[in-house]
Amino acid sequence: ACVSQEGLPADTVVPDNRNGAAALARHLIELGHRKFAILAGPTDLCAARDRLDGFHSALSSAGIELAYHNVVHGAFTRDGGYESTKRLMATGTDATCLFAVNDVMATGAMAALRDLGLRVPEDLSVAGFDDIPTLRDLTPALTTVRLPLEKMGEEAARLALDGETPDEPRVIPVQGEVIARESTAPPTRS
């Protein structure tokens, strides 16, 4: 059994990126946000696409339209988040909340906003995805989706040891958890 290795001829356990991003979107909507921007990562990365699709799906279900110009693709890195945020802000976005499809991009986004003289969350809420350990060092602390890495490892071990040999490899999605922190707050403007 594998973790996050779809396409191999073996059972695999994967994070449920789509539903995790949808849960995060619902949380942000509950805070009062209606205008969103997304740092969507590279278009050829499955995890980035799933997170974008899940977030967008939850917005659509709530009757919230996502403006095309508020979706910016860039590298899945801190610098990718920084540059994507600078491009986004140069368009004059009216978003009150920025979702970066991974925490590393969110870290770059927060640095870009700081360099532009904007405050998180007072001027723009920021959320990420992954709950990487270095988030403890960010100020303000980042709202994110925590990947259940321990649970994924346990499930992979269970699959490897269960003795079953299915005809087709199984793909087992594991749900993440929204971790609300100080980088998101109700919007101060509509």
Which residues does each PLM region occupy?
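Bacterial carbohydrate/catabolite-sensing allosteric modules
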Residues: 1-190
